Design a protein with these regions (language model features):
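Alpha-helical transmembrane segments in inner-membrane proteins
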Residues: 1-314
Length: 314
């Protein structure tokens, strides 16, 4: 596929999946499309949420993979989703029902700040990656203890949130997520050349006059905020952060961030809308997180079996 054709084609594919998700995102199919209230009140927010969440997680994954030079890195590996899970678990223990989103966002934000604090003290990608992984393990252990000591009735809301869903966000949440995505996209665009240099190593980036620490900090800040916003509203949605950037590199045949940033946004949005559509076409809707795993696992396996080092391809 030619580079010049990849973005227009991705726009068409993403628009197609979005339209299908809007039209067929439920068991009643086209018949329900005549009901304006159903479309505007339920299906449109859900489809927009899927579109924005996919784009956000894919953009976050692209930045993480670039600064760590690892095709399997994504925002969740840094403990952000685990922090959101801790906030959600504490909220359910406290008997907070509809307010689970705010504790989840607070937990994700605290973990993000811890990672950013470490990032400001070290320039080692491996040290930062190990800290994020260990932070995630530690927080998940606390969540497991809380689950063990919480009544089953209180855990229903937590289990529902942790399964992942695009149905929990209204238009206010959509506006918030769109604003976070716009800010992150601006940050990534400004940081694009620096991330190109980082692909060749910190030493090369420094030799070219860039500041690797600043580049990594901006990428981590952007990715963490995206993951925190998405996870707090929708629960942990995995694999988009890995699959989206990988598909983008394959389609645009480049690792230059001027090309991969828009392609990653579109790939993530398309995959997310497709997963949401597949989760809704059955008589009983399936958890979108599980459907995403089914879609994403083959992509991850393909990366593992045929991966090559990330490098800038012209």
């Amino acid at each position: 596929m030619k580079k010049s054709n990849s973005i227009p084609l991705l726009i068409l594919v993403t628009g197609l999946f979005f339209a299908l998700d809007l039209l067929l995102g439920g068991s009643s199919g086209f018949a329900a499309f005549r009901e304006e209230g159903l479309v505007i009140g339920i299906r449109l927010p859900r489809a927009l949420t899927a579109l924005l969440c996919g784009a956000a997680l894919s953009l976050g994954g692209l930045q993480m993979q670039s600064i760590f030079r690892n095709p399997l890195a994504d925002p969740h590996i840094m403990g952000v989703s685990a922090g959101a899970g801790l906030g959600a678990a504490l909220a359910t223990m406290a008997g907070i029902g509809s307010g689970i989103i705010f504790p989840a966002f607070a937990g994700a934000l605290i973990c993000s700040l811890l990672v950013l604090a470490v990032a400001s003290r070290t320039s080692s990608s491996s040290t930062l990656l190990m800290f994020g992984v260990m932070l995630g393990f530690a927080v998940n252990a606390i969540v497991a203890i809380l689950q063990f000591s919480t009544a089953a009735e209180q855990l229903k809301l937590f289990y529902s949130w942790s399964a992942g869903s695009f149905s929990n966000m209204g238009f206010t949440g959509i506006y918030i997520l769109a604003a976070v995505l716009a800010a992150a996209l601006l940050t990534a665009s400004v940081n694009a050349h620096g991330m190109d240099l980082i692909l060749f190593g910190d030493g090369f980036a420094s030799f070219c006059g860039a500041r690797p620490g600043r580049i990594k900090f901006l990428a981590l800040l952007s990715s963490s905020l995206l993951a925190a916003a998405v996870t707090s509203y929708c629960g942990p949605i995995g694999f988009i952060g890995i699959a989206g950037p990988h598909l983008a590199r394959l389609l645009c045949r480049s690792s230059s961030h001027r090309r991969t940033i828009p392609c990653s946004l579109l790939c993530g949005a398309a995959v997310s809308c497709a997963a949401d559509l597949l989760s809704q076409i059955w008589s009983t809707p399936l958890p979108v997180g599980s459907v995403m795993a089914i879609i994403g696992i083959p992509v991850v396996m393909a990366i593992l079996l045929g991966s090559r080092p990330l490098s800038r391809e012209q």
